[in-house]
């Protein structure tokens, strides 16, 4: 009898557990209600008394998907030109998380004061539409790419030691703008990065850019080869899949543009590689290439490695140039 009671108790316990978990698994999950609205309605809600720049990634992604929802409890991140009259009043507006920026006529970039110790800079050259004083970037993915590369990194010299501006930085910026217009995010490398690192300037020589292979625009290369680009193709070496390096010219200025490739080691670690400058066939390998930062060279914004000393040491290993790192 005792055995029968134990067996009955065991079966009842199993039955209760099965019923309980079946109830959990079959009960629909009730998600928090989301008030979906037209994106124009959301932007109308965000309209400000003075011009502002929408820099909130979540809202920008909603606009790009054309699937917006109202979150009145969340502060939306906006950029505000701090020189505007009454700009300080937006700090008290519960709708906004305000990030002040400086828009100097002497530079080609906007400078954001994220915190006391954190500065970010993005190019001024981006298309936007205005909705109720809210400036909304047209190419949202490009704008987000600008912001992801916006952490400011200064060179090693003190400001009072930096040489006077030269036309070289203007020429370099013009070349960079053409690449950006073609959907790429070029960054300085080679001796151009080295010159910035040790002198905070650029020099009249053949400049050096790199572009991630995954970010390279094949249509740009095709237009170059057809002579349908603002740039002139001077030389091409290798293929896109195997260390492509090209030399391009804008007026009298030339630049090498190399591709940076990503690979996985057998242990799963990431390495990057490119082919050497001057069309040499040797391969230059880098440890995991870090996120990119921005820097100012005589009023122009350029993207660079966030650890330039490490990158220079890897690229110029066993040469005299590592003395500067």
Curated annotation (Swiss-Prot):
**Keyword Membrane appears in the UniProt entry:** yes
Q: Where in the cell is it found?
A: Membrane
Q: Which residues cross the membrane?
A: 10-30
Signal sequence span is: none
The annotated topology with respect to the bilayer is:
Single-pass membrane protein
What is a single cellular component term in the Gene Ontology annotation? membrane
Question: A Pfam family matched by this chain, by name?
Answer: W02B3_4_N
**One GO BP annotation of this record:** protein glycosylation
Q: What is its main location?
A: membrane
Cross-referenced InterPro entries, in alphabetical order?
A: FKTN-rel
Alphabetized UniProt keyword annotations: Membrane, Transmembrane, Transmembrane helix
Protein's name in the database: Uncharacterized protein W02B3.7
Organism equals Caenorhabditis elegans
């Amino acid at each position: 009898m005792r055995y029968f009671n134990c067996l009955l108790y065991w079966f009842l316990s199993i039955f209760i557990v099965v019923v309980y978990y079946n109830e959990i698994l079959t009960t629909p999950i009730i998600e928090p209600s989301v008030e979906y609205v037209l994106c124009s309605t959301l932007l109308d809600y965000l309209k400000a008394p003075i011009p502002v720049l929408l820099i909130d990634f979540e809202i920008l992604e909603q606009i790009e998907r054309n699937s917006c929802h109202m979150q009145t409890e969340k502060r939306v991140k906006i950029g505000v030109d701090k020189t505007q009259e009454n700009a300080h009043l937006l700090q008290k507006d519960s709708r906004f998380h305000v990030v002040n920026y400086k828009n100097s006529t002497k530079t080609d970039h906007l400078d954001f004061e994220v915190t006391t110790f954190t500065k970010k800079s993005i190019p001024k050259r981006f298309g936007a539409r205005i909705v109720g004083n809210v400036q909304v970037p047209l190419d949202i993915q490009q704008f987000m790419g600008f912001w992801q590369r916006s952490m400011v990194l200064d060179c090693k010299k003190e400001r009072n030691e930096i040489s006077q501006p030269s036309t070289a930085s203007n020429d370099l910026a013009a070349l960079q703008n053409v690449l950006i217009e073609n959907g790429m995010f070029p960054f300085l490398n080679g001796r151009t990065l080295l010159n910035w690192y040790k002198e905070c300037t650029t020099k009249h020589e053949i400049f050096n850019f790199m572009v991630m292979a995954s970010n390279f625009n094949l249509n740009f290369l095709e237009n170059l080869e057809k002579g349908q680009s603002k740039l002139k193709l001077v030389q091409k070496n290798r293929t896109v899949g195997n260390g492509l390096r090209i030399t391009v010219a804008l007026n009298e200025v030339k630049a090498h543009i190399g591709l940076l490739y990503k690979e996985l080691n057998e242990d799963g670690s990431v390495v990057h590689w490119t082919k050497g400058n001057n069309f040499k066939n040797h391969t230059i390998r880098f440890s995991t290439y870090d996120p990119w930062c921005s820097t100012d060279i005589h009023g122009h914004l350029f993207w660079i490695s966030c650890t330039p000393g490490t990158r220079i040491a890897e690229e110029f290993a066993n040469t005299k140039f590592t003395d500067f790192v």
